[in-house]
């Protein structure tokens, strides 16, 4: 069973910004599909838990300088897409 996807308003703004920068959405959509269906991500995406202000969230690399911050909630099978962007474009990373 796949997870329901919730997109934060900031994530939606981030996606628009990435499109304006000329990024293609296919790599992001591929990763989101894997996460939604609980398919393990390839090691080159460097999926890892975050600490500090981002504790409880996870980050993976869509491309070398394109990140996705997300959270999985197992009790309700929810995938929350929190932020996407570059290292310098996401405060606090």
Please state what every model-predicted region is:
Residues 8:
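Residue-level signal for threonine
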């Amino acid at each position: 069973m796949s997870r329901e996807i919730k997109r934060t308003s900031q994530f939606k703004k981030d996606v628009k910004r990435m499109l304006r920068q000329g990024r293609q959405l296919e790599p992001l959509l591929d990763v989101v599909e894997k996460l939604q269906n609980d398919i393990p991500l390839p090691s080159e995406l460097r999926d890892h838990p975050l600490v500090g202000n981002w504790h409880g969230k996870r980050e993976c690399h869509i491309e070398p300088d394109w990140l996705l911050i997300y959270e999985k909630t197992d009790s309700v099978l929810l995938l929350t897409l929190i932020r996407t962007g570059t290292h310098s474009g996401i405060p606090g990373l």
